[in-house]
Amino acid sequence: MSFVLILPLIFFLFSCGVRKSIHYLPDINQYSLDIPKINIINDSTFSYAQNYLTKNKQQLWELYIQGNPLQLGYNNGALTQNLMRRQEEIFFSKVESFVPSKFKQKILGKFLKWYNRKMYLNVRDEYQVELYGLSQYSSEKYDFIAPRYLRNLYLHGAHDIGHALQDLAIVGCTSLAVWDANSEDGDLLIGRNFDFYVNDEFAKNKLVEFVEPNEGIPYISVSWPGMIGVVSGMNKEGVTVTINAGKSKIPLAAKTPVSLVTREILQYATNIDEAIAIAKKSKVFVSESILIGSAHDRNAVIIEISPNNFGLYHAKNSSKIFSTNHFQSEAYKNDKINQKHILESHSEYRYKKLGELLEEYKELSPEKMAAILRDQSGLNHRRIGYGNEKAINQLQAHHSIIFSPEKKLVWVSSSPYQLGEYVCYDLNIIFSEKRLQNGEFATSSMNIAQDPFIDSQEFKDYKECKEKMREVEKATSTKDQFLSDQYLNHFKALNADFWKVYFETGKYYYSKKEYQKSKIEFEKALTKEITTTQDKNTIKKHLNKTLKKVKLKK
């Protein structure tokens, strides 16, 4: 990296409030604290006073914590220390694979400190105190990125930064709410897939958190160890939040992570109006849709929030509302970024698919909602390949979740993706003295069975295809690594309806100067349901390059 590029970063580091931000620590003196002494019951069950961590038979980790902000952080960190450190290792090893140079890692660390310089000014004091407590149990291994407290703060903006800076396709969530005529018993029912994908290891240790703060409303949240923000959750009052990434400009500074806005909503809102008021006062740095459900209102709305705009989308004369990854409110009607995103991404396709599935299943029960969230077909039941991001089930969800706010019931998917058993939790029981009377947090009699697809040959083929995809990509970029036609034909047959197997095979043949074979593969890819306009244009560019090579050979 040239000195010309380094110089601005050095300037940033010692300007714009960076020095102040990197030395900042929250004031913890107002809070009492008992340092947790963990009781190890077995290799997957731990306790401290009335705080617990255990792994259920579906392999979901369940955490119950209570206390003031500082105590919550310490209790969380002490109980989940090994899981949290493992999660941090998985996340930052991904960063290290992108930036292997130690020198460039230092530059990245400086950039992050500059980029996140205003974050601490936009996060509630109590959450900073909680993060401070949690960070006492973080590893020192990644101090080159930032000190432990700041690093934990930065990680809470990872979802936001990921889709803002890289516009990652790995953030493409789907959620819906139905009530009255569209639900089986007329009650509000909400479902969502959280398609935030780092890698399979990152999704391995799912954490179902039950949090009982000294101030505010107890709530359930589903995410990963080390996370105090909320991406999917419901409070004891029956207010639900789920977040879906929108299309964003690249912001100049990180402010309030959306997951901490939704945490505040769960902790302090009892209805939709209170949730809207919290969202309105928040200074976010990316665009996000927040689907809010409310037992008190027996309704759901979508808050569409961005750095310079705020919109509300209500279902007019309807008892259903859908949210994918584009905005629908009047406030964004003329937003060019949003319009372009609707045309070029897979968001509108999934939106239409939700409408198609609701017509098919009609009055939804939790079981029917699970079937919708697991659906892998395209519009009109077209086979579009397993793992296609145009599907509701993209086979990459970190988790899937179903809420029944009026009954205070929550169903959380177990691995893999949303295919495993949905485990039922009754908040009426969990946030009462009855919570562990039967020896578990779950109300297992109400679980939703795993998807039969788990045991199918198609799923085995899909997993093999993913492994072989990596081999094909590696061979494409390695000059002296060759694959046989037999190998490549088998690779394509494993997921024959998916455009990407033909595209990757075409790139492989092109790299080995087999242009006629490459041409055939790119043409085949273009006959399939391609995920985005950008993907289609990329294939066309590769095909045009190949056609020129074919002509030259003649």
Segments from the language model and where they lie:
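A general structural signal for short secondary-structure boundary/capping elements
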Residues: V222-W224, N235-E237, V286-S289, N308-A315, ...
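Short, surface-exposed beta-strand-loop junctions and turns on beta-sheet-rich folds
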Residues: F196-V198, S248-K249, N308-F310, P416-G420
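Bacterial Sec-dependent N-terminal signal peptides
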Residues: M1-I22
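An acidic- and aromatic-residue-enriched active-site/binding cleft used to recognize and process polar
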Residues: G17, A181, N193-D195, G246, ...
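Extended amphipathic alpha-helical segments with heptad-repeat/coiled-coil character used for oligomerization
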Residues: V301-F322
